[in-house]
Amino acid sequence: MHHNNHHHGHHGRYQHHHNQHLKRPLKGGTEDDDILEITPIGSGSEVGRSCVLLKYKGKKVMFDCGVHPAYSGLVSLPFFDSIESDIPDIDLLLVSHFHLDHAAAVPYFVGKTKFKGRVFMTHPTKAIYGMLLSDYVKVSNITRDDDMLFDKSDLDRSLEKIEKVRYRQKVEHNGIKVTCFNAGHVLGAAMFMIEIAGVKILYTGDFSRQEDRHLMGAETPPVKVDVLIIESTYGVQVHEPRLEREKRFTSSVHQVVERNGKCLIPVFALGRAQELLLILDEYWIANPQLHHVPIYYASALAKKCMGVYRTYINMMNDRVRAQFDVSNPFEFKHIKNIKGIESFDDRGPCVFMASPGMLQSGLSRQLFERWCSDKRNGIVIPGYSVEGTLAKHIMSEPAEITRLDNVNVPLNLTVSYVSFSAHSDFLQTSEFIQEIQPPHVVLVHGDANEMSRLRQSLVAKFKTINVLTPKNAMSVALEFRPEKVAKTLGSIITNPPKQNDIIQGILVTKDFTHHILSASDIHNYTNLKTNIIKQKLTLPFAQTYHILISTLEQIYEQIIESTESTGGGGNEKPTITIYNEIKLIYNIGVSIILEWNSNTVNDMICDSIIALISQIELNPLSIKVRNPNFNNIDEKEEITKDDIEKEKEKEKEQQDGDDDDDDEIQIKVVSRKSRKLSNKLNTITEVKLLLEQQYGNFKVDENDPLILHFNLDNQKAIIHLETLTVESLDQILKQKIENSIKRIILSVSPIGNNLNQINNQDNENNIKMETDFK
């Protein structure tokens, strides 16, 4: 018996290019694993704590794992409790970029849940992630933050677990294929394409198709996508052109310092900050009248991370790479790094870039509270602000704000908003969808109102695309019924099958690819091990060889007789081989040794042989044995009518029983043709008997005993027993009698060589499929 451990998996809808496809017809109804389920547990109709779980064919993938910038502690996390039962089975966590709203919950998820899967990021993302979150842990320790989500050991554990990938690199894990593409947005940002059972899902993360000062725009994956999970931060808004945006930004800053004010630019330490530093440094170089105005950048973290920017200059655009050949564009001439507010001379005009970007806490909040009541000062908000944050609140220009110490103070400084957030706008999003043409689009990472407007616009523009906007912890289910395709390999395709042929082989499934192989090819095409179980059984048998062979030939068709030497004395024992698979060695008057290689079919045949031999041994008189004396007939001759007549006469003369001399058992080697003739006569007798039982009495032809006449209510038919054919003018009667004869033949004839009667029952070893000639 061939044992193989089948790899678990399912068929994909993709087509392989090979000579032969074998397709199993789909059953009616939808199976559970045909449903692809997408559940945002963060970023569903909101911006912040991006985290999306995808489930399909038993595989589970999580995209991003961030915190919400408007909250702190456990309430800032994605809704992990809503997927608690799924967490131990999540295969992959794919993190798109280093921003906290996409990555800051990773240490918590890896260290404090039952997650056991693999984590992937690009090289720059991992480098900056480590620095950003080390800083987060230090700040939490200094402020003795009770809401601290994780500590240094959790972060270290996550860094050990994170694996790095490059753009366009293909990774495969547990039947899931992963490829990442450049997403623009920030250094190292990636879109992730995953493929499960031929269904392709693209998660964009935050992306921008517009090239800026240092980054290339997002690329369009060159493959057909089935589901697109895409950000919708800016909804239907359209960004102003880059040069206009830069001009408005530098003008806003210039106006503040020109009136001797202090200009605060709240930014996140990394990402857009580097873009803004490039713009300001270039503007200051071009405007000597501003050289006396210092630009401060208060971030030791950013200074540390600039090393990463220099390392991965090759992942930036041509402009930066060309400039890098001359000098490092990230070594600024007019920008001073300072550690904090203590070493800062707060006199005269200045430009101050400080984090965080939404003024929730930290240095940017301290400076804002210090400067907000002086009308000479100004703030330029350069990125997207989330609902519930101070940055979002002051954009509506309230008369006063509440400081962190709960004191209300007037808001007199000027508030400007210039978007540098490097998110996709409506034009970029719709162009991207137009190029990819996905049947399904799932919107995430957007304010509920913006997302709703974007959905309406996309539905109007792309009438055939299904656009979905799930809320947090709510799932969308999409049905994919992939074509079930198996590829034939090895010796099984030596003779290519025709339509409706039966293919016998072993179906080996691994990671949604399927192959049908001959058992003998298993070790050539897989790493599976096969074993053959050899069976040997001894049965007591005191009857004659003639009884044995005659009985077997009535049941089994392909029989070869030979002799086999056993022991050292040169004794030769009669041997019978059935279907080239099963060997019977006859020990005269003592026993039969049965040998075979175990498999489903051979075991079944051997069961029947054992039953047959046991019956002969218990009651030899119950076995109808044919006359053995036909050695005078030439083996090559056809069986004639005269042969049949002679056989019938000899049967009448034949006396029951064996030779009188019981002391000496004679082995009679009986001619193959004579036994064949005897079996044919038996078949004719059975056919005649059973036809008479079914249709009543037949009249035997006067001149030929092998012709029967049937006559009932003027319905006439002639049956030729020798050829088992029927003549009749009544086609219905003719067909009816022919069908009866076929059924009788099937029941009384030996089992055929091809064993179809048995094999068709053997569903595990047979795969009946239609042949696909695509």
Swiss-Prot record:
Residues at the catalytic site: 423 (proton donor)
Functional description taken from the UniProt entry: Component of the cleavage and polyadenylation specificity factor (CPSF) complex that play a key role in pre-mRNA 3'-end formation, recognizing the AAUAAA signal sequence and interacting with poly(A) polymerase and other factors to bring about cleavage and poly(A) addition. Has endonuclease activity, and functions as an mRNA 3'-end-processing endonuclease.
Region (Disordered): 1-30, 636-665
Residue positions binding Zn(2+) 2: 101-102, 206, 445
Cited Pfam families: Beta-Casp, CPSF73-100_C, Lactamase_B_6, RMMBL
Enzyme nomenclature, EC number: 3.1.27.-
Residues the record lists as binding Zn(2+) 1: 97, 99, 185, 206
Gene3D superfamilies: 3.40.50.10890, Ribonuclease Z/Hydroxyacylglutathione hydrolase-like (3.60.15.10)
Molecular function in Gene Ontology: 5'-3' RNA exonuclease activity; metal ion binding; mRNA 3'-UTR AU-rich region binding; RNA binding; RNA endonuclease activity
UniProt-listed CDD domains: CPSF3-like_MBL-fold
GO cellular component: mRNA cleavage and polyadenylation specificity factor complex
SUPFAM superfamilies: Metallo-hydrolase/oxidoreductase
Keywords associated with the record: Endonuclease, Hydrolase, Metal-binding, mRNA processing, Nuclease, Nucleus, RNA-binding, Zinc
Residue ranges, compositional bias (Basic and acidic residues): 638-655
Keyword Metal-binding: yes
GO biological process, one term: co-transcriptional RNA 3'-end processing, cleavage and polyadenylation pathway
Cofactor dependency: Zn(2+)
Localization annotation: Nucleus
Known partners and oligomeric status: Component of the cleavage and polyadenylation specificity factor (CPSF) complex.
InterPro entries registered for this protein in UniProt: Beta_Casp, CPSF73-100_C, MBL, Metallo-B-lactamas, RibonucZ/Hydroxyglut_hydro, RMMBL
The name this protein goes by in its record: Cleavage and polyadenylation specificity factor subunit 3
Cofactor note: Binds 2 Zn(2+) ions per subunit.
EC main group: hydrolase
Gene: cpsf3
Native organism taxonomy: Eukaryota, Amoebozoa, Evosea, Eumycetozoa, Dictyostelia
Family to which this protein belongs: Belongs to the metallo-beta-lactamase superfamily. RNA-metabolizing metallo-beta-lactamase-like family. CPSF3 subfamily.
